[in-house]
Amino acid sequence: MASLRVSVLLVAASCLLLGSGLRAGPRTLVLLENINLRETHSLFFRSLSDRGFDLSFRTADDPSLSLIKYGEFLYDNLIIFSPSVEDFGGNINIETISSFIDGGGSVLVAASSDIGDPLRELGSECGIEFDEDKTAVIDHHNYDISDPGQHSLIVADSESLLKAPTIVGKAPLNPILFRGVGMVADPDNPLVLDILTGSSTSYSFFPDKPITQYPHAVGKNTLLIAGLQARNNARVVFSGSMDFFSDAFFNSAVQKAAGGSNRYAKTGNYELAVALSRWVFKEEGVLRVGQVSHHRVGESSPPSAYTVTDLVEYSIVIEQLSNGKWVPFDGDDIQLEFVRIDPFVRTFLKKNGGKYSVQFKLPDVYGVFQFKVDYNRLGYTHLYSTTQVSVRPLQHTQYERFIPSAYPYYASAFSVMFGLFIFSIVFLHMKEKEKSD
């Protein structure tokens, strides 16, 4: 009887472990302004759950919050839906979030016109500057028909989106509904992405005050949604609108107030929000290097050292993460460089089945070289692969017996020898005339 109980307990424990393993997905901490956001933004959170994300909902001021424990990150992703928070709870602060990003973590931030200093400081760390508190993006030409009168319920056309299907999705979107604070990008930060910009008639200011000074953001410099991919491939997305992710904006009809504008039954917010979440949480645009090989043409294994002017073949396997599986990447602009200090050879790789390959002739220069693939494209993780090889000069037995470029020198040498031979014959057989008395 006792052994039966032990067996039952072992089976139950195994089932629990198996179930927890099946449920395990990317660990995501969601910091909320208040717990009601789980209901008002349920469609967005449900889309994450349906894709296997393990969501942990906490209020932003929870005193038990922790992002790092014993030097290890407790979560893979961070969502901040608490724009007006003045202090995060527990041991979470801007330094902790910056360390999380430096460690490769992904962060999604939603702000609003009521924005606190922590989010403003986090934006500055990532090259994004929010406008002042209580300001909003205003557009007197592109506002929704349901706007209450301040013209801050903006209708953004899909033409204002970044031309990067990996980030914003491939399907054409309906107009985007936006209400929130404007942002500007640091012009000295080349890593910032202008994902969604305002129209040429938009600006950011206090909606209930007359304009007395030049606005913080004007025209297409006004960012509604911005992104960042760090050099370590960590990704961050900032949205100036908390309502952008809400169920109300997902299901709302949209129509510009201008006469003759088309009416759409639904906004494009949901499709864009899902595409952004897939990119920022590294479900899209993730590349990796598979097998790399190089050898002389006609051989199958790399030599200990190449010889100058060898004809070599280089191949590399590049894979892309798609729906949780690694599949061959399809690209036509991948280049290979053969580098010593500067590139001696730069050529495009051609797709051959599931790999990219190319044949080329080594330069007539010896030294230590690298086969280098450095692929950095918008929306994709930075792909970098190097393989170091040695290139030696020709051995004495490998040189040609006569070098065509040296024919003039050969001719000059033989002509001198021939001239000396003729001179010697003439000199030896020449007889001086006898002097007469």
From Swiss-Prot:
InterPro entries: DDOST_48_kDa_subunit, OST48_MD, OST48_N. Residues 429-437 are cytoplasmic. It is a single-pass type I membrane protein. Coiled coil: none annotated. It is found in: Endoplasmic reticulum membrane. PANTHER family: DOLICHYL-DIPHOSPHOOLIGOSACCHARIDE--PROTEIN GLYCOSYLTRANSFERASE 48 KDA SUBUNIT. Component of the oligosaccharyltransferase (OST) complex. This is Dolichyl-diphosphooligosaccharide--protein glycosyltransferase 48 kDa subunit. It comes from Xenopus tropicalis.
